[in-house]
Swiss-Prot record:
The keyword Ubl conjugation does not apply. This is Inhibin beta A chain. The gene is INHBA. Residues 263-275 have a biased composition (Basic and acidic residues). GO terms for molecular function: cytokine activity; growth factor activity; hormone activity; identical protein binding; peptide hormone binding; type II activin receptor binding. It comes from the Eukaryota.
């Protein structure tokens, strides 16, 4: 959090420095509060008068983040045709029909992916023995009950092959989902292979794979669509039948040892085609137990997934909020050396932080802030004199494409450049 605040304070501080420079009529302004971000709330609300100062602060901020003392001197710009051709060839950006360059914001996409991964749960469910031979039962964890969007789902099966096998190099393994249906409830148009069982059950082919039968190894069967349908129906139980017609010919066997399988059932399986986990030590067989690997997340509209966002300043609230501010590089005369993007979202935080919202959920992401505020409200030293500040609580990166002094084209990814949310420290 200190690094987060530092980046956020930098832009705010630049504005404060510019604002505090001696100007006619400035003597009447009162001293700034204890923290720079809080001072933003005391600045004049007339945007036209404040804009030039804010633009100067933005310029200083961008140069500082690019480690430049001054803007590059582009005296002889690269011809437009050569520039656009280089961008196309190097894949550092996209050139629109109007000739404008749109930068490939790789870092922004990575940040979105990282945020998405943080919200994704990974669940591994080991198989239990099904009600019949060559069947497996998976009971998805209660953790999965709040998940509705399947990112990936795979069933892992271990194929054991005898060393002497040379008869066949490939075998086909099929996975069928077993479903119970009421009489007449089965849809005739389902895109799957279905076999009626006493009019009460059906089987749907959910995965099929041709595998190498010359070595013992794990094989992965994708079942994302099947699990997605299961979650959409509000179910958590999955019954699978495994079929491998050529396995008996090769002597290969799929280890289908579930955690409810009894020893007498194991012995019976050894006498048949070996698909029930024939041969080998029981402990070793257990290490090859089938499992389901599921990666899933909550949907965008899930009520528990929505977290409170920081307030947007709309002119009607005085408490801590995010102020939108966009600076066009063309308007400030910087489009001659900054190729892309077309401008900078110089958002900043402003507003008051009353004690009743400081450190509360949604206004700050810091547990530390909540604890400090708890003691501050009760007048406990040394926290009694500390004041809560309106600061950035979420920042996002920005990619820039620009010329340096040597007419070289630079693409730089800058972390924590744009304020996304604000809260009270």
């Amino acid at each position: 959090m200190p690094l987060l605040w530092l980046r956020g304070f930098l832009l705010a501080s630049c504005w404060i420095i510019v604002r505090s420079s001696p100007t006619p009529g400035s003597e009447g302004h009162s001293a700034a509060p204890d923290c720079p971000s809080c001072a933003l709330a005391t600045l004049p609300k007339d945007v036209p008068n404040s804009q030039p100062e804010m633009v100067e602060a933005v310029k200083k901020h961008i140069l500082n983040m690019l480690h430049l003392k001054k803007r590059p001197d582009v005296t002889q710009p690269v011809p437009k045709a050569a520039l656009l051709n280089a961008i196309r060839k190097l894949h550092v950006g996209k050139v629109g029909e109007n000739g404008y360059v749109e930068i490939e914001d790789d870092i922004g996409r990575r940040a979105e992916m990282n945020e998405l991964m943080e919200q994704t749960s990974e669940i591994i469910t080991f198989a239990e023995s099904g009600t019949a031979r060559k069947t497996l039962h998976f009971e998805i964890s209660k953790e999965g009950s709040d998940l509705s969007v399947v990112e990936r789902a795979e069933i892992w099966l271990f194929l054991k092959v005898p060393k002497a096998n040379r008869t066949r190099s490939k075998v086909t393994i099929r996975l069928f989902q077993q479903q119970k249906h009421l009489q007449g409830s089965l849809d005739a148009g389902e895109e799957a292979e279905e076999v009626g069982l006493k009019g009460e059950k059906s089987e749907m082919l959910i995965s099929e794979k041709v595998v190498d039968a010359r070595k013992s190894t794990w094989h992965i069967f994708p079942v994302s669509s099947c699990i997605q349908r299961l979650l959409d129906q509000g179910k958590s139980s999955l019954d699978i039948r495994i079929a491998c017609e050529q396995c008996q010919e090769t002597g290969a066997s799929l280890v289908l040892l579930g955690k409810k399988k009894k020893k007498e059932e194991e012995g019976e399986g050894k006498k048949r085609d070996g698909e029930g986990g024939a041969g080998g030590d029981e402990e070793k067989e257990q290490s090859h137990r089938p499992f389901l690997m599921l990666q899933a997340r909550q949907s965008e509209d899930h009520p528990h997934r929505r977290r409170r966002r920081g307030l947007e300043c709309d002119g009607k609230v005085n408490i801590c909020c995010k102020k939108q501010f966009f600076v066009s590089f063309k308007d400030i005369g910087w489009n001659d050396w900054i190729i892309a993007p077309s401008g900078y979202h110089a958002n900043y935080c402003e507003g008051e932080c009353p004690s009743h919202i400081a450190g509360t959920s949604g206004s700050s992401l810091s547990f530390h802030s909540t604890v400090i505020n708890h003691y501050r409200m009760r007048g406990h030293s040394p926290f009694a004199n500390l004041k809560s500040c309106c600061v950035p609580t979420k920042l996002r990166p920005m990619s820039m494409l620009y010329y340096d002094d040597g007419q070289n084209i630079i693409k730089k990814d800058i972390q924590n450049m744009i304020v996304e949310e604000c809260g009270c420290s």
